[in-house]
């Protein structure tokens, strides 16, 4: 599996701070299984890639449900922004309509 990722979350995964990637559970994500490998490509530098192994998958109907159930400090938030973390943060990536259509997934990963 190959996915694009912006530089900030890519660095958070690389340093081990982010272990759960949040995505729409669309057709592409429905193909992912535990044990699979994902190659992330930096959206600003295609030569910068990162390979991870899928450890677990957490399916939810919405990011609101996901935010209530997963540890947000593992999802890319940190002590500086955890208090303002909101499911609406994900609407800059995925419209509410698409969230309602596909549902969402938290992909727990480990570095390879």
Tell where the protein language model's regions lie, with residue ranges:
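Short, charged/polar surface micro-motifs in flexible loops or helix N-caps
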Residues: 29, 45-47, 59-63
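Contiguous surface segments at macromolecular interaction interfaces
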Residues: 66-112
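Beta-strand secondary-structure signal
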Residues: 2, 51-53, 106-108
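Compositionally biased, charged N-terminal/linker segments
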Residues: 1-34
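Short connector loops at helix/strand junctions that flank enzyme active sites
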Residues: 33-35, 47-49, 102-104
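A structural detector for beta-sheet-dominated domains
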Residues: 6, 23-25, 41, 55, ...
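Short, charged beta-turn/beta-strand-edge "cap" motif at the junction between a beta-strand
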Residues: 26-27, 37, 42-48
């Amino acid at each position: 599996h190959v996915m694009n990722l912006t530089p900030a979350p890519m660095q958070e995964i690389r340093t081990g701070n982010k272990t759960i990637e949040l995505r729409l559970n669309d057709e592409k994500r429905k193909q992912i299984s535990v044990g699979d490998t994902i190659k992330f490509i930096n959206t600003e530098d295609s030569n910068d890639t990162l390979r991870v192994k899928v450890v677990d998958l957490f399916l939810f109907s919405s990011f609101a449900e996901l935010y209530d159930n997963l540890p947000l400090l593992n999802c890319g938030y940190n002590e500086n922004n955890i208090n303002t973390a909101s499911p609406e943060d994900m609407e800059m990536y995925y419209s509410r309509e698409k969230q309602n259509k596909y549902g969402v997934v938290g992909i727990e990963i480990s570095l390879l």
